[in-house]
């Protein structure tokens, strides 16, 4: 990589060398300490450019060559190199016509390298900004992940509470179901009792109907007997009147005959006594039958009334108990329905909460996976950026090594120039407005100094170019082909 350049414009590199423009007086002696410059030139130095450039000039018949320090003030005393005046006479030397093209190519190459270096620097800055941005995002995602991780125990606690409530509701529903079964059993017992009472009432009603039939039959018999008694009484009355009439008729006949016949009739029939006795017997029978029938009817009626009252009271109590049981059944049914509704609501709430919890957990897992993917991608991007940064730093390190190598070469050259040690090759050309071109190469071999002096007529400038080169063969050549050693 070539790091020396002749700057016709404003270009920068790791080590910028300033070259004169053709046709202009561009080199004068400037006895500054620490920094030497070429007046009238345009150009500059890079990040690690040479702080003290070469200074050369002509003063009268002597030629001075001085070298400034590198990245610091130059030594206070630099010995001048005296050049033989005869060497300044113009020589007819051929100049390579391709030197300008080579210089232009080198200039463009240095510009492109400077542009690449600036692009690398911008890229490094951009990558640093991206690295900071990714670190901020990573910290934000980590904090966000920590914040989201607190939701899972909350959902678990809420779900556990709902499960406990569901278990309590299930226990209450079991208890209510057992109570409902007990009440249904009691209801079945009361239903059986009610059916038994209904059957007993039906039996009592049947007995009452049978007794009523018997009473009716007895009443009919009583009526028949009363009718018979009336008929017998009428018959007795008829017979009595008949006998009385017969007796009256007989007495009238007897009175007409006026014969008194006294007969001792022991067979005297006392009909009145007989009739009275029969009547008394019938009256006694009727009275006794009536009394017995009335007493039996009254007893049966009282018994039936007591039975009806008893069964009515039992039926009323049974109806009240049935109504009470119906109300209790309705109340328990309402409670069971309410418990079932509450249980279904709680189950729906538990299912909804579980679904919401699962949805939240799945969403959290998805977000966590997205964040992990983003984090992994950020890590990969960071790794790529770090790798590119390492590549850029390696390039920068190589450039720094080259700069340090060139600095050491320049320091060694200045030291040799100050001590007067080292091989100096002076080539003189008589071209007008000649430009010195130097190719600089980095190598591990010892530097060799090659100096070319281009001499022009008295109205032209004197340019002294010093080139440090480290070729693999430890040789130094001056561009342009003006020296046979190149």
Swiss-Prot record:
Keywords: Coiled coil, Disease variant, Intermediate filament, Isopeptide bond, Keratin, Ubl conjugation
Keyword Coiled coil: yes
A single GO molecular function term of this UniProt record: structural constituent of skin epidermis
Keyword Ubl conjugation attributed: yes
Ranges for region Coil 1A: 107-141
IF rod domain ranges (all copies): 106-417
Start and end residues of each stretch annotated as Tail: 414-486
Region (Linker 1): 142-151
Coiled-coil region list: none
Annotated GO biological process: intermediate filament organization; keratinization
Additional note from the record: There are two types of hair/microfibrillar keratin, I (acidic) and II (neutral to basic).
Database matches in PANTHER family: GATA-TYPE DOMAIN-CONTAINING PROTEIN (PTHR45616), KERATIN, TYPE II CUTICULAR HB6 (PTHR45616:SF7)
Protein name: Keratin, type II cuticular Hb6
Organism of derivation: Homo sapiens
